[in-house]
Amino acid sequence: MSERKLFTSESVSEGHPDKIADQISDAILDAILAKDPEAHVAAETCVYTGSVHVFGEISTTAYVDINRVVRDTIAEIGYTEAEYGFSAESVGVHPSLVEQSPDIAQGVNEALEAREGQSDDFNAIGAGDQGLMFGFAIDETPELMPLPISLSHQLVRRLATLRKSGEISYLRPDAKSQVTVEYDEHDKPVRVDTVVISTQHDPEVSNDQIRQDMIEQVIKAVIPAHYLDEKTRFLINPTGRFVIGGPQGDSGLTGRKIIVDTYGGYARHGGGAFSGKDATKVDRSASYAARYIAKNLVAAGLASKAEVQLAYAIGVAQPVSVRVDTFGTSTVSESILEAAVRQVFDLRPAGIIKMLDLKRPIYRQTAAYGHMGRTDIDLPWEQLDKVSPLTEAVAALSEGA
């Protein structure tokens, strides 16, 4: 009998409390970058019934109406009714943003390499903190993402589309999804074992109606039919009722959905959150660079699965380590892949910022439904423009080995 394994990932909607916080933090970041691309921003948000607190550190010449940004973001998500216990116009907004610490700023604004006399312009910016970051890609889906997180994101995005269009009028903004995929003995996905959807709803709708709509209009519209069979389980609002939701039901904080933001637990995570941080924070920019590297490695056919780890020291431009793990799927040695990565990609913070053009206000759109593998928006770290340079570098290094 062949050995089969299950793997599960989850996603949450834009109306989930933690995702509201992420979107507010990134909306503030975008508003500042639109006026001051050189700004340093670390904006955190806390949401709960009737209140939003925004706090953190910024260095900018721009003036931004934080109150307006917060309210507009909440309205765009869909919290516009007082009965939700959290609405754009009635919520209390409490900003508390201060100047970035000069001790941190001196290392970011002038890297160790620059202080030691190295004149390269890309040595000017040091990493905003120490830390380790991971990027991942796998050939399970066209976007080179693990199937469980890809399907989970698609389910909650479909829910949001049906809610905002009015096609399912009883839906409210808060929702979660979870997909369990069965893999064969070769680690290839063969079927979906379980789908969980919990969606906030108006009080008068029946559970039978919700179940029917979720299966027919959401699950079957998203998950390819060949992954579904008579044994697939559908668990729809398994508590039996989900009227109270959003910040009225749970408080939310920026940075609490880092696994949803990345690979659904299929790959490792360095622990740093993304939202509210400008690109000098390598928690964000180096994670994007690592995904960029991994995706191009897999797209080039150099591996069917690739995980890239980058690590940095605060105030130092060059990464302290670069590691590529292909889990035995690479066509050449991993040492050659690592050498090729170092040749093709400039992994200093300034190099990443230039390579991916990260001083633009592009972050609000990433703050729900995943930062990686997006097919609905155009993100620079999802481009495949490094396939040829990587292939050429690997060929040259292999000849010289």
Curated annotation (Swiss-Prot):
This is S-adenosylmethionine synthase. Its cofactor is Mg(2+); K(+). The keyword Hydrolase does not apply. GO terms for biological process: one-carbon metabolic process; S-adenosylmethionine biosynthetic process. It comes from the Bacteria. It comes from Streptococcus equi subsp. equi (strain 4047). The gene is metK. Keywords: ATP-binding, Cytoplasm, Magnesium, Metal-binding, Nucleotide-binding, One-carbon metabolism, Potassium, Transferase. L-methionine binds at residues 57, 100, 250, 281. K(+) binds at residue 44. CDD domains: S-AdoMet_synt. ATP binds at residues 16, 174-176, 241-242, 250, 256-257, 273, 277. HAMAP family: S_AdoMet_synth1. It catalyses: L-methionine + ATP + H2O = S-adenosyl-L-methionine + phosphate + diphosphate. Mg(2+) binds at residue 18. Binds 2 divalent ions per subunit. Binds 1 potassium ion per subunit. It holds the Pfam family S-AdoMet_synt_C. Belongs to the AdoMet synthase family. Catalyzes the formation of S-adenosylmethionine (AdoMet) from methionine and ATP. The overall synthetic reaction is composed of two sequential steps, AdoMet formation and the subsequent tripolyphosphate hydrolysis which occurs prior to release of AdoMet from the enzyme. Its EC number is 2.5.1.6.
